Swiss-Prot record:
GO terms for molecular function: 3-phosphoshikimate 1-carboxyvinyltransferase activity. Its EC number is 2.5.1.19. This is 3-phosphoshikimate 1-carboxyvinyltransferase. Keywords: Amino-acid biosynthesis, Aromatic amino acid biosynthesis, Cytoplasm, Transferase. Phosphoenolpyruvate binds at residues 15, 96, 124, 171, 350, 394. One of its GO terms (cellular component) is cytoplasm. The gene is aroA. It comes from Chlorobaculum tepidum (strain ATCC 49652 / DSM 12025 / NBRC 103806 / TLS) (Chlorobium tepidum). Belongs to the EPSP synthase family. 3-phosphoshikimate binds at residues 15-16, 20, 169, 171, 195, 319, 346.
Amino acid sequence: MSTFQGEVTTLPPDKSISHRAALIGALAEGTTEISNFSGGYDNQSTLSVLRDAGISIRQEELSAGDGRIERRVVIESNGLWSFREPSVPLMCNNSGSTMRMMAGIMAAQPFRSELVGDASLMKRPMKRVADPLRQMGAEISLSDAGTAPVVIHGTKALKTIEYRLPVPSAQVKSLVAFAALHADGQSKIIEPIRSRDHTELMLGLATIDRPDGVREIIIDGRKPIAAKPFKVPADPSAACFMIALGLLGERSEIVLRNVCLNPTRVAYIDVLQEAGAGLGIENVRSEGGEPVGDIVVRSCSGLKPLRISDHGVVAGVIDEVPMLAVLSAFASGEFELHNAAELRTKESDRIDALVVNLQRLGFECEQYADGFVVKGRKTVASEEVEIECFDDHRIAMSFTIAAEAAGASLRLSDRDVAGVSFPNFFALIDSLRQ
């Protein structure tokens, strides 16, 4: 395998924080400036949907002074009810985050709206979106299969809610919080298993951590939200791919600068360090309420097999599972995952997608309803292998790293889908290759 070395300052801005900064800016009173906003397709879909719903948004590209081009987004809004009835369906493209969180906002607006997406998003489950919003008084209709289009007849008279999350989901938590901001009174979200907490941090919501590990999130409705600036750090989920590249490369060392180190986002780093990965964290500081720092990754030849089953750990690494599975398979020949049925409802059925493609590379795999196991590798693919991306950016990027590890020629069914979250993915790999 090649050697990869260098300092990376061009990781994509964090996808989750970019979504939320734009949505909160649309709910705030005044001018919200967001620096280092993501240029990924999903985040651009959020801006497009907000514009179609009547929010004034300006986006410009600026030189960051270190060779990077940084996007700055400026949002003008008059507060919670600044939205206008859309004249067209709100097109979320491939972004489940846009569709789900925007539903919470549209449920509080006194008009009809419709959220739609691309073919992949239109297959994803939306009942978990509709249930709490119906309890709050919004009229929501879905397809017979419980999927989009999400048709919303909103109301200014949303009721408060005490909602216990049935599964760990930062998107559902956020949509309930956004809806509750419009309700007359205090609402509470009960979170048995922690998920990423950017929404709570960025809105400054009160939280209570109970002795039993359950978190309560308190939302006081109908209070004005003051506009404030946001600075978006580098995306730790994108960093995971470069970490895998560095660990699998020969005599490699990569430094990833200014990465978000929110504990709810970097559980995969703990998993890798416990398995013996050569990872270090440096220059940790706080920016905008989020811990940020640099990640140093070095080649590692003794990585132990990854076995992940704890519900809390699974929730913390759910987006990184594709890369962790490929990394563990190539580094140790083994990988095991349980309690991750949520992966079957992502951009693709990621359990099936991983098993299908790992088998094409010669790995012996077995899948279950909630996970799968990689038992070893029987053959090494020497000819060109066709990798089916299933229109899923994380599958495409994970198996690009697999191609580097295998030294094989892989043909991706949809290379461009990486641009959903990581527009410069392929260029960055080439820039690090020695």
